[in-house]
């Protein structure tokens, strides 16, 4: 016991001494400087652009508004606080698998722990603060990587902040996943160096496993770079004995395989979800490859590439200068062959569109060069290596604390001044007619050229590290002013104002909703697709992007709008809304009092009131039915009628199709006693739009551009449109537009019939004594069951597992919802969701972990010893395999696309 206490105190003292040592204090000083530079440079850009906390503007724009912030901040905040499941969500699509979307959105990033610093209602403003925190974290990761070089500490600081202010942060921050990859890359490369130096593989395995689990997409991009750099290091730079190189390749290969196996628990479900999504290709490698070879840069994409030329001037100037210097010395160029090869390969990856596309797996939607973080890393890393080898090593008197503080203050003052001065220049530039053509890309290239010239002069003539730091701070402020300016990617639904309005509605909404009480964005005055995540409510609407291929067809058949990979609330009927437990409607325009009651008016923060209405009708969550399975019809009214008959057991027609009564462009009728609701949908295209007047009043169609849209169809309005509720009156519908009447469909829904059916179901359905929503499942108990099946308004998916009274049963689909076989009497139903690939992933990851732990323990205890002869054989095999793989890799990713590109240029020139 005494020996253990003594050992404990010795370890404690050792840690304490290490933390208080001069080296640790110097590290803390460096980290403090990095924090100040990043914070001041970004806040300067915020200040001049009127971005919070200096104004009402936000860095939110583009995909941040509709995807990144709702999913990556609001939903992750709920996950971190135990309010949501990271793989399955009830907030969207009436319950859906989000394993693929979570991976592509980097929702598992350790940087998301910063969200604990914010309340939920403050997240809209907190995104501006989160940006700074992420950039600081990226800089810190790079700092610890760069410390392997024998240079002055100021070089570590400069390299770190340069990396943090790369295009991954200043351009790709709109899809935050690139920033998360940028944070992990230096840590992974620390692990690579440890493997290379035979100091263990654990560090690499931990962080590369994390990279794959955080985002399988950028994880694969990082893996491509690891292969590229490892081959260059092995075959072009490593002068060690071949036997040593073989062992290094074996260690690296085993470490990569272990990481991939450990990450399987997350990666396998993510890959299955991604591959099944409608957006994914056919999975044919040859087709994808041939398509990629024919890729060409569009003007928009190339303008994005130009914008990514930020804060590369210093490392590029250093590389060019020092390589020229190295060329004068015999043998020096050979030392850098691997780095030069990688730089050239990455340069080709930006210039040749097919190579760029292959880095992304052969396809992508906008956002080119998502591997820009790799380019920034390689340039800074190479520049540091060259600086280490060619810097002036003359001993100089160390600076006093006062000198260091003065240097920092000067740098920060210059940073602030440069940002404010350049803002005036940028403002004037944006006012020029040429800005519409040249855009920010031209200005970014010009800034890089100017600063490159300054750096060349400083490095060649003075080599004054302080001067370089001061100039760098000025450049960081200048590039930040351009990058964070809220004058781009902010049109229509991509404006931060829409996100702010959704956030305001979430804050001001007083009505509480229970589990399975869904909400509907009727007219999209709150112009936000992912609004349920912001409100923390449940709805159909979502923009997870990677969704089940059945979701869109199922909801479209019921008359709900779909757009690209988005599901929207707009559409449907009062029947389908009631059946799907959509009990609340958000609407800017007044809804019929015969069908809804107003709960409250909610201020959206823009001087407008959004009405929250409650559906007057209600159906039980679980409804008994004799229908086992039902496929959707191609005609929306038929689908609604078939579903009504399946639920009620009646043969009555709920919606009477009167499309044949349209006379030219007019439909007119007399509605008698009994409430009727008129619905419209068209099969016309956007090239043949139609607008609608009902009794002389304009009908508005949901649209992403404006709430005043009158054309059908539109992106948010291409399903069923409610034309009004009528009783004892004449109704005249006028269609304007050159559209064939056969493409227009009208149907009368008998509201009184629906109301009577709802009351009958409530009376005869039996009692639901338990209804509990789990994060990825449901528990319910129903008494007095008299029919064979129970309908549940939950999206059908093969990942659902169901037990009824403890026995496994097979669920079926009724128009994309669930049909559960039950027993007469009392039924206890338990539903659990497990995405495809999860069980296999768990088994693979668990076995790998146990094997690794057991092997490490047995080696430590001496129970097993390394078979040196076996290792030699395995190393030789691994080395040969790696050589073949590397040759094929270089040929497929670089050689063939470059030759194909040059062939195209040659043909164009000849023509």
Identify the residue ranges that each predicted region occupies.
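Extracytoplasmic/lumenal acceptor-recognition loop(s) of multi-pass membrane glycoenzymes
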Residues: 94, 100-104, 472-492, 508-579, ...
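Membrane-interface coil-to-helix junctions
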Residues: 40-138, 161-183, 221, 274-279, ...
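Membrane-embedded helix bundles of polyisoprenyl
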Residues: 132, 136-148, 153-237, 251-271, ...
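Contiguous transmembrane helix-bundle modules in multi-pass membrane proteins
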Residues: 199, 218, 336-501, 721-723, ...
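Active-site-proximal, structured, solvent-exposed surfaces of multi-pass membrane proteins
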Residues: 11, 18, 22-24, 72, ...
């Amino acid at each position: 016991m005494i020996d253990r206490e003594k050992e404990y105190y010795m370890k404690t003292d050792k840690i304490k001494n290490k933390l208080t040592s001069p080296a640790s204090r110097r590290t803390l000083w460096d980290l403090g400087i990095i924090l100040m530079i990043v914070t001041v440079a970004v806040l300067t850009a915020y200040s001049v652009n009127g971005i919070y906390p200096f104004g009402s503007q936000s860095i939110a724009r583009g995909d941040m508004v509709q995807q990144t912030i709702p999913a990556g901040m609001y939903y992750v905040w709920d996950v971190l606080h135990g309010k949501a499941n990271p793989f399955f969500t009830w907030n969207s699509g009436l319950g859906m698998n989000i394993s693929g979307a979570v991976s592509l959105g980097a929702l598992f990033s350790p940087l998301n722990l910063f969200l604990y610093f914010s309340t939920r209602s403050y997240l809209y403003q907190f995104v501006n603060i989160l940006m700074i925190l992420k950039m600081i974290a990226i800089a810190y990761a790079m700092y610890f990587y760069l410390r392997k070089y024998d240079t002055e500490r100021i070089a570590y600081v400069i390299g770190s902040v340069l990396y943090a202010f790369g295009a991954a942060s200043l351009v790709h921050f709109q899809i935050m996943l690139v920033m998360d990859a940028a944070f992990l890359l230096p840590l992974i490369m620390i692990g690579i160096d440890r493997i290379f130096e035979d100091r263990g593989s654990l560090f690499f395995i931990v962080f590369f496993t994390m990279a794959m689990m955080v985002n399988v997409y950028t994880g694969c991009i990082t893996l491509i770079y690891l292969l590229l750099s490892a081959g260059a290091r092995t075959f072009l730079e490593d002068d060690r004995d071949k036997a040593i190189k073989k062992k290094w390749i074996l260690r690296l290969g085993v470490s990569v395989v272990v990481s991939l196996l450990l990450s399987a628990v997350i990666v396998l479900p993510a890959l299955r979800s991604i591959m099944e999504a409608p957006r994914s290709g056919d999975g044919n490698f040859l087709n994808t490859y041939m398509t990629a070879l024919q890729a060409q840069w569009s003007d928009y994409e190339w303008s994005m590439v130009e914008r990514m030329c930020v804060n590369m001037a210093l490392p590029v100037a250093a590389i060019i200068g020092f390589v020229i210097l190295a060329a004068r010395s015999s043998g020096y160029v050979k030392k850098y062959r691997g780095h030069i090869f990688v730089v050239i390969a990455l340069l080709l990856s930006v210039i040749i569109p097919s190579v760029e596309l292959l880095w992304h797996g052969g396809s992508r939607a906008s956002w080119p060069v998502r591997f820009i973080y790799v380019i920034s890393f390689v340039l800074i890393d190479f520049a540091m290596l060259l600086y280490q080898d060619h810097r002036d090593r003359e001993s100089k008197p160390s600076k006093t604390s006062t000198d260091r503080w003065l240097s920092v203050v000067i740098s920060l003052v210059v940073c602030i001044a440069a940002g404010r001065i350049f803002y005036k220049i940028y403002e004037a530039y944006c006012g020029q007619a040429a800005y519409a053509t040249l855009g920010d890309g031209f200005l970014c290239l010009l800034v890089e050229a100017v600063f490159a010239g300054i750096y060349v002069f400083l490095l060649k003539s003075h080599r004054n590290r302080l001067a370089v730091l001061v100039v760098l701070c000025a450049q960081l402020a200048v590039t930040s002013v351009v990058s964070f300016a809220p004058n781009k990617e902010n049109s229509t639904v991509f404006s931060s104002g829409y996100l702010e309005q959704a956030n305001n509605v979430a804050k001001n909404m007083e009505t509480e909703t229970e589990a399975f009480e869904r909400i509907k964005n009727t007219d999209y005055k709150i112009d936000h697709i992912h609004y349920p995540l912001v409100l923390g409510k449940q709805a159909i609407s979502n923009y997870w992007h990677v969704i089940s291929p059945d979701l869109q067809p199922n909801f479209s058949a019921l008359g709900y709008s779909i757009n690209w990979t988005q599901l929207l609330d707009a559409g449907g009927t009062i029947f389908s809304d009631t059946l799907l437990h959509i009990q609340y409607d958000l609407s800017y325009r007044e809804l019929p009092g015969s069908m809804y009651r107003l709960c409250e008016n909610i201020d959206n923060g823009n001087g407008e009131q959004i009405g929250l209405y409650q559906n007057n009708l209600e159906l039980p969550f679980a409804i008994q039915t004799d229908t086992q399975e039902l496929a959707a019809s191609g005609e929306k009214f038929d689908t609604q009628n078939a579903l009504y008959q399946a639920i009620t057991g009646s043969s009555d027609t709920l919606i009477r199709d009167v499309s044949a009564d349209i006379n030219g462009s007019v439909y007119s009728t007399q509605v008698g006693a009994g409430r009727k609701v008129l619905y419209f949908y068209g099969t016309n295209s956007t090239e043949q739009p139609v607008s609608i007047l009902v009794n002389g009043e304009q009908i508005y169609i949901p649209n992403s551009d404006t709430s005043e849209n009158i054309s059908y169809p539109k992106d948010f309005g291409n399903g069923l449109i409610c034309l009004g509720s009528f009783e004892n009156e004449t109704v005249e519908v006028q269609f304007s537009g050159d559209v064939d009447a056969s493409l227009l469909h009208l149907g009368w829904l008998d509201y009184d019939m629906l109301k009577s059916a709802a009351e009958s179901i409530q009376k005869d359905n039996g009692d639901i004594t338990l209804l509990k929503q789990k994060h990825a499942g449901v528990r319910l108990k129903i008494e007095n069951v008299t029919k064979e099946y129970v309908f549940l308004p939950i999206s059908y998916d093969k990942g659902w597992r169901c037990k009824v009274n403890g026995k496994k049963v097979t669920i079926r689909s009724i128009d994309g919802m669930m049909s559960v076989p039950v027993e007469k009497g009392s039924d206890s139903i338990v539903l659990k969701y497990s995405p495809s690939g999860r069980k296999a992933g768990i088994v693979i990851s668990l076995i790998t972990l146990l094997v690794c732990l057991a092997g490490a323990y047995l080696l430590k205890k001496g129970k097993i010893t390394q078979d040196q002869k076996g290792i030699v054989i395995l190393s030789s095999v691994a080395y040969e395999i790696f050589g073949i793989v590397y040759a094929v890799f270089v040929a497929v990713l670089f050689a063939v696309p470059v030759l194909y590109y040059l062939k195209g240029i040659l043909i164009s020139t000849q023509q």
